[in-house]
């Protein structure tokens, strides 16, 4: 089995967890590759990773079935965007207190990898949503694509907001 690793290099916990993760992967004979952007961060910490293990997102998307995001939910979202054009299975290890998208705790990594290897998991379909703000003068402000949900809020309490919902450019509902 092969897996791609998409780490958040800004998370200090990554560096203390890294050795344990690699030991688990090696014990389970899981071949791993690391996103190319991570090279500088690992080298600056004197963490030796064979240069052939660093791969581009494009290479990983085309050659691997599984991608493991390591960090927080933001890291998961970045990985989801990076691999959105590829047919990969994305899961993640969260390095903080709570993870909604990166749902694997560090203490559960070995068990979860066993489930992945034996294909005893349930896939959860997620989708990217696009949104924009249509201003009164007709101009549009396009917002970044998001995963699964869009939260609509008001700048001022008590100010009315009207929302037109379109699905695939077809008007669905006004709120």
Question: Could you say what each language-model-derived stretch is?
Answer:
Residues 98-175:
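Catalytic core of DAGKc-family lipid kinases
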Residues 19-24, 84-85, 166-168:
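Short, solvent-exposed amphipathic alpha-helical segments in soluble enzyme
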Residues 1-66, 107-122, 133-144:
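ATP/NTP phosphate-donor binding region
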Residues 69:
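Redox-cofactor binding/interface segments in oxidoreductases and associated redox assembly factors
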Residues 14-15, 74-80:
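Short glycine/serine/threonine-rich phosphate/pyrophosphate-binding segments
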Residues 78, 83-100:
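Gly/Ser-rich helix-loop-strand patches that form or flank binding pockets
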Residues 10, 72-75, 98:
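Short glycine-rich anion-binding loops that position phosphate/pyrophosphate groups of nucleotides
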């Amino acid at each position: 089995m092969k897996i791609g690793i998409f780490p958040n290099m800004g998370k200090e916990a990554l560096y203390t967890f890294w050795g344990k993760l690699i030991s688990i992967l090696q014990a389970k004979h899981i071949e791993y590759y690391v996103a190319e952007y991570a090279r500088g961060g690992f080298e600056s910490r004197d963490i030796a990773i064979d240069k052939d293990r660093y791969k581009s997102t494009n290479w990983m998307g085309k050659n691997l079935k599984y991608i493991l995001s390591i960090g927080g939910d933001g890291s998961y979202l970045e990985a989801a965007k990076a691999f959105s054009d590829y047919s990969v299975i994305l899961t993640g290890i969260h390095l903080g207190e709570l993870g909604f998208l990166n749902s694997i705790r560090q203490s559960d990594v070995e068990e979860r990898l066993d489930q992945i290897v034996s294909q005893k998991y349930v896939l959860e379909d997620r989708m990217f949503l696009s949104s924009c703000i249509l201003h009164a003068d007709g101009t549009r402000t396009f917002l970044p694509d998001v995963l699964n949900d869009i939260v609509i809020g008001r700048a001022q309490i008590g100010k009315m907001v009207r929302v037109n919902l379109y699905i695939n450019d077809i008007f669905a509902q006004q709120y």
